[in-house]
C-alpha cells in the first residue's frame, strides 16, 4: 500500500509510478480519509509507502495529523513490523522533513526503514521571491524524475534501509524548525485567497481541484473558501484556474501556474 497526498499532481504521479514499478496494487489518497484515526491493514509481506510533497520544509499538516493517529497491523497480527518507506517530492530542498515524518510515525510505534526524495517542478507561489519554474527547468526536472523513480523502486524491491536523499539543503534545521514552524503558523491558511470576479468564468475547476474539499460555489456560482482550518495552501485552486482569477493576496498577481501533465513526463 502507498499512502499519498498531492495538490497539483506531482506526488500523485510519483506514487502511482512507484506503485506500478513495484507491483503495488493499493494507492490511497490521504486527503480522501476525512475521518481519522486511520487504520492500515497490510497483508503479510506487503510494504507501506508514504509519499508527500514538502510544504515549508516539512510534511503537510494533514499528513502529520493522520499519521500521528494511525494504527497499523499486518495480517491478523498487530505486533509484526512491516517494511515502511517514504518518498517526498520537492521543488528545492527537503530540510528535516523526513525527521519530522519519522517522529510522527514513532508516536504510533511505526519505524521508517528507508527514505527518498524526488525533485519535481515548483508549485509554491505564496511568497514574493517564490514562483513556478521556467519551462526548461520543468522539462529537466520531469526528465530527471523517471530514472530517479526507477532507482527508488529497485531499492524498495530490495528492501533497502537508510536515507537516499539528494536535496536536503545547507540549513536543514533552520529551514524546517524555525522557518518551517513560522510557515505553518502564518502561511498555511485560506484567508489570503480571493477571486478576481471580473476574470472568473464560474467553471468550478478550482473547487473540483481542492484535495481536501475546502471550497464551494456560492449562490451566484462564485468560488468561496470554507475557512474551516482544512486548507493545505497547496495552491491547487490557483494553478487550475484557466483565467488566473484565483489570487493569494497580491503576491500571485504576476506569478505563473503549473499543473502536472502526464504528456510531458
Language-model features: where?
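Active-site-proximal loop/hinge segments that shape catalytic or ion-binding/gating pockets
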Residues: 258-263
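FMN-binding flavodoxin-like domain, especially the glycine-rich phosphate-binding loop
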Residues: 1-2, 8-13, 17-33, 44-52, ...
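Reductase modules of NAD(P)H-dependent flavoproteins
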Residues: 164, 187-198, 207-208
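Iron-sulfur cluster-binding cysteine motifs and their immediate structural context
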Residues: 195, 201, 205-226, 236-253
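Positively charged, low-complexity nucleic-acid-binding target-recognition regions
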Residues: 252, 264-265
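Short Cys/His-rich zinc-binding micro-motifs
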Residues: 200, 231
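Feature detects long, helix-prone N-terminal segments enriched in hydrophobes
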Residues: 34-40
Amino acid at each position: 500500500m502507498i499512502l499519498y497526498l498531492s495538490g497539483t499532481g506531482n506526488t500523485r504521479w510519483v506514487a502511482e509510478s512507484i506503485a506500478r514499478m513495484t507491483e503495488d496494487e493499493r494507492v490511497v489518497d490521504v486527503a480522501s480519509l476525512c475521518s481519522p484515526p486511520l487504520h492500515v491493514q497490510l497483508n503479510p509481506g506487503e510494504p507501506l509507502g508514504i509519499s508527500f510533497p514538502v510544504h515549508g520544509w516539512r510534511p503537510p499538516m494533514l499528513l502529520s495529523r493522520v499519521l500521528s493517529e494511525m494504527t497499523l497491523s499486518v495480517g491478523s497480527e498487530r505486533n509484526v513490523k512491516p517494511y515502511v518507506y517514504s518518498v517526498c517530492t520537492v521543488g528545492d530542498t527537503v530540510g528535516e522533513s523526513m525527521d519530522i515524518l519519522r517522529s510522527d510515525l514513532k508516536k504510533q510505534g511505526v519505524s521508517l526503514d528507508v527514505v527518498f526524495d524526488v525533485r519535481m517542478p515548483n508549485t509554491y507561489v505564496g511568497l514574493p521571491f517564490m514562483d513556478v519554474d521556467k519551462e526548461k527547468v520543468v522539462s529537466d526536472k520531469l526528465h530527471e524524475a523517471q530514472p530517479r523513480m526507477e532507482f527508488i523502486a529497485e531499492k524498495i524491491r530490495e528492501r533497502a534501509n537508510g536515507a537516499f536523499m539528494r536535496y536536503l539543503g545547507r540549513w536543514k534545521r533552520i529551514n524546517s524548525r524555525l522557518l518551517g514552524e513560522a510557515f505553518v503558523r502564518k502561511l498555511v491558511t485560506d484567508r489570503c485567497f480571493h477571486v478576481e470576479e471580473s476574470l472568473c468564468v464560474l467553471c468550478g475547476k478550482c473547487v473540483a481541484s481542492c484535495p481536501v474539499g475546502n471550497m464551494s460555489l456560492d449562490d451566484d456560482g462564485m468560488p468561496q473558501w470554507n475557512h474551516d482550518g482544512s486548507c493545505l495552501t497547496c495552491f491547487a485552486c490557483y494553478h487550475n484556474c484557466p483565467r488566473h482569477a484565483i489570487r493569494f493576496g497580491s503576491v500571485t498577481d504576476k506569478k505563473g501556474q503549473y499543473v502536472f501533465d502526464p504528456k510531458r513526463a
